[in-house]
Amino acid sequence: MLDTNKVYEISNHANGLYAATYLSLDDSGVSLMNKNDDDIDDYNLKWFLFPIDDDQYIITSYAANNCKVWNVNNDKINVSTYSSTNSIQKWQIKANGSSYVIQSDNGKVLTAGTGQALGLIRLTDESSNNPNQQWNLTSVQTIQLPQKPIIDTKLKDYPKYSPTGNIDNGTSPQLMGWTLVPCIMVNDPNIDKNTQIKTTPYYILKKYQYWQRAVGSNVALRPHEKKSYTYEWGTEIDQKTTIINTLGFQINIDSGMKFDIPEVGGGTDEIKTQLNEELKIEYSHETKIMEKYQEQSEIDNPTDQSMNSIGFLTITSLELYRYNGSEIRIMQIQTSDNDTYNVTSYPNHQQALLLLTNHSYEEVEEITNIPKSTLKKLKKYYF
């Protein structure tokens, strides 16, 4: 894989001319120019190679044409706004000795014109050892990228009551996933595109997780009392105005990702494998988007003592940061999955429950002084 923090110039191996485009013109063509031409600007020559899934790249104009990217137009190369899932904007860059072959997703390769067509670039069928199809990628600038931090691999357990009946409201956030997202895939209305690629070619997407007390789950029970209660889970955030329009995917009710092309352009569909692997978020198998939900539950106190009960949910927080040497958070969405709901109580009878896994009721009754009838109810309820 080519370096992801480099700005490149792309020149033809046969004629030494450079791939260039014009400033301020939408859908302008990519042609070959002499580096010393009077009407050429340094930015016309600079390209950023954003890696995507399947070892392909999006070739992006660096600070020219508002981050326009290469796309195919009748076997010619134009630049246009990036659009997720647009196959004509995807390129494979294959090493060929000291140079590279640049192949479109349609199978044809970048070929320099000859003779009267010397300044043209076209897509043609690949031919062996054709110098007009060989390209030099010269690094002309290095971009500072953030260092990947240490990622936690296991979430801490949810809080439990202390022997005196105290309990925390939750646990501290743990960084469980981290990845870089190309700026062309991010809708950031607070920065213009030309500034964006020069200062923030990559955004940082983080996944934090932690336990938090579920709203409505705190229940006090008298001896031998049974109660119904309602707790909340899901998300209160309008996903359309946050993650969908910012990154081009949504979180569905099963906490999985569903990718789509956002109305504002961009989108991360082309790096969904990367997001799946580095953020540890599965693809959704549901059609219903995550919203705020209320869940009915019931708890029973089978003992002769008063009991308190509290439920905890795993909170997943996805946070997007603009990075230009320091981090500025521009998006956050927090969700909780009902499948993570866990209940703890006081007194929690933890010792008795553990003993019941490998001791008889009579043995546990003798050790804990909890009546056999109560132990049976505890086992029925908690197991």
Swiss-Prot record:
One of its GO terms (molecular function) is toxin activity. Pfam families: Toxin_10. Coiled coil: none annotated. Induction: Probably part of the cry34Ab1-cry35Ab1 operon. Proteolytic processing occurs near the C-terminus yielding a stable protein of approximately 40 kDa; this may be the active form of the protein. Expression of the 2 toxin genes in transgenic corn confers resistance to WCR and has been commercialized. Keywords: Sporulation, Toxin, Virulence. InterPro entries: Ricin_B-like_lectins, Toxin_P42. GO terms for biological process: sporulation resulting in formation of a cellular spore. It comes from the Bacteria. The keyword Electron transport does not apply. Transmembrane segments: none annotated. The keyword Secreted does not apply. Residues 26-138 form the Ricin B-type lectin domain. Component of a binary insecticidal toxin active on western corn rootworm (WCR, Diabrotica virgifera subsp. virgifera Le Conte) and probably also on northern corn rootworm (D.barberi). Both proteins are required for maximal toxicity. The larval midgut epithelium is probably the primary target. This protein alone has no activity against southern corn rootworm (Diabrotica undecimpunctata howardi Barber), but it synergizes the toxic effect of its Cry34Ab1 partner. The 2 proteins individually and together form ion channels; channels made in the presence of the 2 proteins have higher conductance. Belongs to the toxin_10 family. Monomer in solution. Copurifies from parasporal inclusion bodies with Cry34Ab1. This is Insecticidal crystal protein Cry35Ab1.
